[in-house]
C-alpha cells in the first residue's frame, strides 16, 4: 500500500444522551450490525448488544436479534432494534430481495416481538419504521417522508390499512417533521 484513505473522519457529536432528552428512559440498548448506528447509540448513552449472526444484510439472524431485544426489554426502558436488510436490498436495486427482506422483517421480527409483548404486565410500545427511503430504482437514499407504525396496548387504529409511503401520509399522525416522531413515540 502506498496510501491510506480514512473513511468518514469526524469528531464526537455534541448531543444529549437519550436519558437526558427522555428522563423516563433510565437504561437503554441498541442492537445493530451497522457501526454507524452503534456509534450513535453509544453517544446517546445506549449500551450496545452484540448479536451472533447479525450481518446487516438479508441473511441476518432475525431470531437472535429478536431474542436479544426481548431479553433487554426485561431490564431496559428502551431498545432500538435496527435491521439493515431492506436498505441493502435497495442499494442493490433488487426489488425481489427488497420484498423478501420486508416480509422477513414482518414475519421474523415485528410479528414475534408483538406476540411476545402484547400481554406483558408492563406495557411495551412498538414502533416500526425505516431510517430513510432507499428506492430500488435509484439505489441510494432519498428524503421523502417514510411510513411508520406505532402500537401500544389500548391504541385505537386509524383508517390506514396499508403500510407504505402514500398510505401513511393519510394516517392519524400525518407527516411528522424532524424530531416529532420520537417525541410522539416517547410520550
Name these PLM-found stretches:
Residues 1-187:
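Feature captures the catalytic ectodomains and active-site-proximal regions of enzymes
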Amino acid at each position: 500500500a502506498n496510501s491510506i484513505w480514512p473513511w468518514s473522519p469526524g469528531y464526537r457529536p455534541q448531543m444529549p444522551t437519550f436519558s437526558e432528552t427522555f428522563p423516563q428512559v433510565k437504561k437503554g440498548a441498541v442492537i445493530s450490525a451497522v457501526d454507524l448506528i452503534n456509534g450513535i447509540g453509544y453517544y446517546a448513552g445506549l449500551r450496545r448488544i452484540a448479536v451472533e449472526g447479525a450481518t446487516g444484510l438479508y441473511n441476518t439472524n432475525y431470531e437472535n436479534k429478536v431474542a436479544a431485544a426481548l431479553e433487554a426489554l426485561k431490564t431496559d426502558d428502551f431498545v432500538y432494534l435496527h435491521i439493515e436488510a431492506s436498505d441493502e436490498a435497495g442499494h442493490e436495486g433488487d426489488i425481489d430481495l427488497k420484498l423478501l427482506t420486508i416480509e422477513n422483517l414482518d414475519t421474523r421480527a415485528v410479528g414475534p416481538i408483538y406476540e411476545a409483548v402484547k400481554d406483558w404486565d408492563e406495557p411495551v410500545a412498538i414502533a416500526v419504521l425505516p431510517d430513510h427511503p432507499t428506492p430500488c430504482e435509484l439505489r441510494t437514499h432519498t428524503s421523502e417522508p417514510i411510513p411508520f407504525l406505532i402500537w401500544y396496548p389500548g391504541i385505537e387504529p386509524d383508517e390506514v390499512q396499508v403500510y407504505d409511503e402514500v398510505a401513511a401520509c393519510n394516517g392519524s399522525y400525518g407527516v411528522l417533521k424532524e424530531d416529532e416522531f420520537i417525541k410522539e413515540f416517547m410520550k
